[in-house]
UniProtKB/Swiss-Prot annotation:
Pfam families: ATG8. This is Autophagy-related protein 8. The record marks 116-117 as: Cleavage. It is found in: Cytoplasmic vesicle, Autophagosome membrane; Vacuole membrane.
Amino acid sequence: MRSKFKDEHPFEKRKAEAERIRQKYADRIPVICEKVEKSDIATIDKKKYLVPSDLTVGQFVYVIRKRIKLSPEKAIFIFVDEVLPPTAALMSSIYEEHKDEDGFLYITYSGENTFGNFETA
């Protein structure tokens, strides 16, 4: 899936920003969170997040739910490289496994399980 953030910002600028963030906030992970293109779920108000490295995927999903004001009965799925990461996984381990060459971790979200793949821990 194409990232709008990548389309809007050149690689060198993204890489420099991620490096600056990692130097200044060593215990935080730079995350870009974008909606899956054809999903009918609400669009998030901001794409860039500085996530504590000890946050779990489940806790991050909670943050996203709050940002898009998603009601409790509605489902949300987040994907890293088109795969659903384990809810209990730490964001730091997801970052180490899936960070982009520019230094950001790219996460997409959707109201439906559009890809259908689960990552097993």
